[in-house]
Amino acid sequence: MQRIDHSLPWSHLGTERTLSVFRYGAGTRKVYIQASLHADELPGMRTAWELKKRLAELESNGQLQGVIELVPVANPIGLDQHLQGSHMGRFELGSGKNFNRSFVELSAPVAELIGDQLGGDAQANIVLIRQTMGQVLDGLPAPLSQLEAMHRLLLRHACEADITLDLHCGQCCGKA
């Protein structure tokens, strides 16, 4: 297992937040799994931590056929937000923005850059699309907030995957 820690910029003085990605296995195929983008949706995070243990076992036994990237805590910003004893993980307190909205829109700029380059070779098309998504992300101006930086990191990992899972649990979770 490889742990990739991304320090989020724009922290408050004397503080730091980190987005941790756990990478298991090797190969050309990749599955990307993130949990708790709404940081108050804790069942997804719990499931991801249990999956983390299982993936470590599978990797140590050589049973993984490809790469699995797991982000059990996809939103360290929201996980750290509390107001008068209540967890506030759905919206960023400073801006009021929903953590699961306002990701960079890639489809239009990617389509424009690719133009008519897609052909009959599906694998070559996948490579071209992923490279172009990376190119678009690289060409963006610097993020203006910690939320923007976090979104871009999550998006970059997801864009490289063959399968992406975003674990959510609605408002009713854990309530009788």
Where are these regions (language model features)?
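Structured catalytic-domain cores with a bias toward divalent-metal coordination
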Residues: 1-176
